[in-house]
Regions:
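Edge strands and adjacent loops of beta-rich recognition modules
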Residues: 54-65, 184, 189-197
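An extended acidic
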Residues: 1-69, 147-179
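Beta-strand-rich interaction surfaces with strong enrichment in secreted/lumenal proteins
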Residues: 53, 79-82, 190-194, 203-209
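Short Pro/Gly-enriched beta-strand edge/turn motifs at strand-loop
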Residues: 43-50, 73-78, 186-191
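Primarily extracytoplasmic ectodomains and periplasmic/lumenal surface modules that are beta-strand-rich
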Residues: 11-13, 101-105, 224
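Surface-exposed coil/turn segments at beta-strand junctions on protein surfaces, enriched
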Residues: 57-59, 85, 99-101, 198, ...
């Protein structure tokens, strides 16, 4: 019941659920879910200039892979995307690689931008759910739950999956607001927990990467 469309930057631009021909929970091709990387005090979104892309599609598994390299930032980002065959959920496995020969602190921002039922009416709600933690976008009978974790080294011999360290929800398209993704530009998110109207949300992972080390993130959007 879920059909996802990706744009030329590998970003979610169509979100059909549960009817592939009718209910698209985005407004247009300019309204997509952004991904950004901040390193050396510079933030770049994948739809900014400077990224070079390659794409693969694995027909046997219905999995796509987007690889994006930014030579200026010396960062590589890879995303493998799939819709589960037995559940209405999008899964993304994101890897971010430090391409330089020294340690760096890297922040990864994942942005969600829904217009539930393709509506511009100010009726959507975005809410942080602390118990999981997760971000819930909902309106009427439609709900989308965003969850994500990063694989973190907690000791010299042990790794474990940990949740994002910051989040925020916001508004766009009213009062000259462009969306909560703008809050990421200084590297820190405000931590707003709920908004009602034309809403979006952002989560952040911050990690230290050694030379050529890879950060691994698992991300999902479950639909109901």
């Amino acid at each position: 019941n879920l059909n996802i469309g990706l744009n030329d930057h590998g970003l979610v631009s169509d979100f059909y659920f549960p009817d592939n021909a009718y209910e698209n929970h985005t407004l247009d091709k300019n309204m997509f879910h952004k991904i950004g990387v901040r390193v050396d005090n510079k933030l770049s979104w994948l739809d900014d200039e400077g990224w070079k892309f390659s794409f693969e599609y694995f027909e046997d598994g219905l999995i796509s892979r987007t690889t994006a390299i930014n030579q200026s930032l010396q960062i590589k980002l890879e995303s493998k995307d799939a819709v589960l065959y037995d559940k209405d959920a999008l899964l993304r496995a994101v890897k971010v690689t430090n391409l330089v020969d020294y340690n760096r602190e890297v922040a990864i921002f994942l942005h969600q931008n829904f217009a539930i039922n393709s509506s511009k009416h100010l009726a959507d709600t975005a809410q942080f759910i602390p118990d999981h933690p997760a971000i819930l976008h909902y309106r009427g009978k439609r709900a989308f739950v965003v969850a994500a974790q990063i694989l973190s080294q907690v000791s010299s011999t042990h790794h474990e999956w940990q949740s994002y360290d910051q989040h925020t929800v916001g508004l766009f398209g009213i009062e000259n607001k462009e969306g909560s993704w703008r809050d990421a530009e200084d590297g820190e998110l405000a931590g707003s927990n709920v908004e009602h109207g034309q809403t979006d949300s952002v989560i952040r992972f911050k990690t230290n990467l050694e030379p050529h080390q890879v950060a691994q993130i698992q991300y999902s959007i479950a639909c109901a």
